[in-house]
Each structure stands twice: as C-alpha cells, then as structure tokens.
Design a protein with these regions (language model features):
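Active-site-proximal loop/short-helix segments
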Residues: 1-3, 79, 83, 121-136
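A metal-dependent hydrolase metal-coordination microenvironment
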Residues: 1-86, 205
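Histidine/acidic residue-rich metal-binding segments in metalloenzymes
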Residues: 19-20, 24-32, 39-41, 56-65, ...
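Short, basic, glycine/proline-bearing loop/turn elements
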Residues: 38-45, 91-96, 137, 165-171
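Hydrophobic faces of well-ordered beta-strands that scaffold small-molecule active sites
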Residues: 40-44, 69-71, 121-123, 163-165, ...
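Catalytic metal-binding/acid-base residues of hydrolase active sites
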Residues: 45-48, 74-76, 126-128, 168-170, ...
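Surface-exposed cleft-lining segments at the edges of enzyme active sites
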Residues: 85-103, 129-142
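Charged catalytic cores and adjacent phosphate/nucleic-acid-binding surfaces used
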Residues: 130, 135-256
Length: 256
C-alpha cells in the first residue's frame, strides 16, 4: 500500500506473484515438517477490486497444494476502504458523498465477487464499517443496504460458504467482530455457519481476541464453529476436504 501511495503501482504488483510462490513453498515445507503434530491447511485471501481479477484468483486457486481461499473486498471504486481516513473519504466521494450509497456500492461489489469466485469462506463480511462515521449503526435501517446484505447472505448460504467471525475488528477498536450483531443474527436465521479468524498479519496477532470472539458467538446462540479437515492424497493432486465442527466449549479451553 505504501508503494501505491507513492504512485509506484507497477512495482507493487510485480512483486506479488514472487511472494505468493515463496509463500506456497514455505507453507508446503511447514506442512510436511509438522504433519505428525498438526494439520496445516494452505490457503490465501483473494482480493476482488474489479471483475478482471476473477481469472487471476481462479488460476491461483488451481494449484494442487491450495486447499481453499477467502473471498474479500477491501476497495470500492478501486479505492481502499479500510486503510485510513483519507482513502475512505476518497471512496466516499467516488460514491457520491453519502455513506449509505458507499455501503450499497460495497455490497454490490461483494455480490460480484461472490458470483465470480464462489469462495468457501467470505472474509470480514462488513469491513466497510471499520472507518465509517458510526461503525455501530444499525444497518438494517438503511433499506437499500439491508436488501443487499440479505441478498449476499442468501447467496453465500446457497453456495455453501461460511462467514468468518473475524476478531481483527476488536483489535482495531470496534465493539463487535465482523460481522456485527444484526448481520450475524440474520446469517444464523438462514442456517449459516461461522469459522474463526484472527486476520493476523504477523505472529503477534495470531488468535488475538479469540476469547472475546467466542463470547460474542455464544451471545448469539452459536455453539460451534467450523473448519476444514484434509484427507490423504497424492502430492500432485488436491486434497479432499471435509467439514468439521468444533464445539465452542472445547475451543474456549485453548483461550481462557
């Protein structure tokens, strides 16, 4: 992002494939080294800024070592909405100057992402609220926004996707994880499932605020989260994955 702010966009983009390949090599090494102790899944977070990102994501996901990817939206009208107040203001202006319209545009782009990528996990569903004027607002009172939220949740449910209970929101000062309570309750009413995420960008952030995240889910009436379990496979083939539920009462024992 710093490279983008300096205008050196091309240099920023050119290094990404190299970093991704290095990540896969290291992930495979760790997966093999620790196979007797822990099952390591290999995945990536797929950015969706516009439609022409689709082919790139699908190509990356085809690698046999990749188990899954997270589909996320961090930009609206090509402008970051979670980086700082200045970028958020630019995105707001690009949407016409009103937050309600910016939220609508965010969820429309998210809908495009869902249709194009069908991600197994949807990242930080309501990231748009992070830098908004009122992150705790009841978005169900914005008719157009709420229609789009429900539309997207229904699509994720039909696709068999999961939402993150993403505790990075707590680390960044919000009162609730992503998604917020009104959205989480709507998702639960559709039979939706949650997986746990710290959205860590470094070792120090691993499992940050998981105890609070578990309490949040329990307050919603959720009693389990979901993960994926790999099955034995040949090295040149993708692993078969099975859904596995983890009771919160057991999960909490690791974060008391």
């Amino acid at each position: 992002m710093q490279a983008v702010k300096r205008g050196d966009v091309q240099a920023s983009l050119e290094i990404l494939p190299v970093r991704h390949e290095a990540y896969l090599v290291e992930a495979l090494r760790l997966q093999a080294n620790y196979a007797a102790q822990v099952q390591i899944l290999i995945g990536f977070e797929a950015e969706f800024i516009r439609q022409d990102f689709t082919a790139r994501v699908i190509a990356l996901a085809r690698a046999p070592c990749v188990d899954y990817f997270i589909g996320s939206v961090h930009h609206v009208h090509g402008i970051p909405i979670d980086y700082d107040a200045s970028f958020y203001a630019d995105a707001l202006a690009a949407s016409g100057g009103g937050e309600e319209r910016l939220y609508e545009d965010y969820y429309d782009l998210q809908h495009d992402m869902l249709l194009a990528l069908t991600p197994r996990v949807v990242g930080h569903f309501d990231l748009i609220r992070l830098l908004s004027a009122d992150p705790a607002r009841d978005v169900s009172r914005w008719h157009g926004v709420w229609e789009r939220i429900r539309r997207n949740l229904q699509l994720i449910a039909r696709q068999g996707g999961w939402l993150e209970c993403n505790t990075a929101a707590l680390r960044k000062g919000l009162d609730e994880p992503y998604p917020c309570r009104v959205i989480a309750l709507e998702w639960i009413s559709m039979g939706g499932k949650f997986t746990m995420s710290d959205d860590s960008h470094g070792v120090a952030q691993v499992a940050t605020n998981y105890a609070r995240g578990i309490s949040y889910l329990e307050s919603l009436g959720v009693d389990r989260v979901w993960t994926l379990e790999r099955q034995p496979h040949q090295d040149d083939q993708s692993a078969a994955l099975h859904d596995k539920s983890v009771p919160l009462i057991e999960f909490r024992k690791h974060f008391s």
